[in-house]
Amino acid sequence: MFKKSSWYALMTILVVAATALSACGPAATSAPTQPAATQPAESKLAVGIVLPTKDEPRWIQDETRFKDALTAAGYDVQILFSQGDSAKEKANVEALISQGIQVLIICPQDGTAAAAAAEEARAAGVKVISYDRLIRDTDAVDYYVTFDSVAVGEAWGQYLIDNATGTGHNLYLYAGAASDNNAFLFFEGAWNKLQPKIADGTFVIKNSSEAVALQSKATLTREEMAKIIGQVTTNWDFTVAKNLAEANLTAAPAADKGTVFIVAPNDGTARSIADAFAADKDVTKYYVTGQDAEKASVQYIIDGKQSMTVLKDVRTLVADAITAAVAYLKGSTPAQTNTYNNGKIDVPAKPSAIVTVTKDNVKAAIIDSGYYSASDFTGLP
């Protein structure tokens, strides 16, 4: 049993964590604060968290924010990393179950492979919150905390369209891991925007025969997207991304270079791909997308090496995940504004908004919102 003061301390942390989700444009606005609970929880927050890897800055940020929020409120939390290994991920879940957790927050390395771990948690009476990436092909998922992943891809497509005049622009497509459901959602969003402009000749696909074969289709099935992603996957790996980009450039004639437009699936791969294109003497200019607003990519944007990123304010996502966990611990149901089909069920969800960041609004979106400090960067506009 814990005191009301502990509950109020927790909710205070949630409010702080959810502050200032920036608006897209020259000014930043604040994200809604989490609703105050009417009753204190009856037990300590028994939550285990499993994140995919320590090798990407994004997940280290999430670890820090989860740990800071829960520790400051007086709760113990254990955060384990799967390091890109689904077997280790399952072992992590089993270890947390053995410690008596009541709620599992898990960002799966492989959405389909994680189904077995989710089912084991469900069998133990644990509520399962799929965090940022969706666990697929199982009914053992209670809730999905995510950003609007389709909107992320649409932001990429719209940015490239806004910077393309005329026709015949060289387009290079890259994607995340084929094992990650989000990679499909991001690609779906990008295709939603780009396909009409591919069909009318604004863009010409240069690095995927599968995409060329499907370019007349406004809506792709998952199987069709899988064919394209299979050709252009980076597997979320910076080295894979760089090697693939270099291979594409080696195979491309000079006419397929010049000014190029590039769909890159996240900031780490965007930097690697941008470096490869920048090093090619036949590439005169490039526009490249990204997401996660990693510090290194924010600096790349300031320096003109990366064109844009999509800010997904993990403070809001962490706060939403904790709020959902608290709701389950109190015997209630988290707020729902949407559902995502995971191949087996429609999973309740509350997707958070995203913000497009370019050099024009980087200060408002990143610095003025409090997401990062100005001292983290040089040459801010």
Locate each region found by the language model.
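Bacterial N-terminal signal peptides that target proteins for export
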Residues: 1-11
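C-terminal motif of bacterial Sec signal peptides marking the signal peptidase cleavage site
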Residues: 18-23
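A residue-level marker of the well-folded mature domains of exported/periplasmic proteins
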Residues: 3-4, 25-381
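Extracellular adhesion/carbohydrate-binding repeat motifs centered on closely spaced tryptophans
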Residues: 15
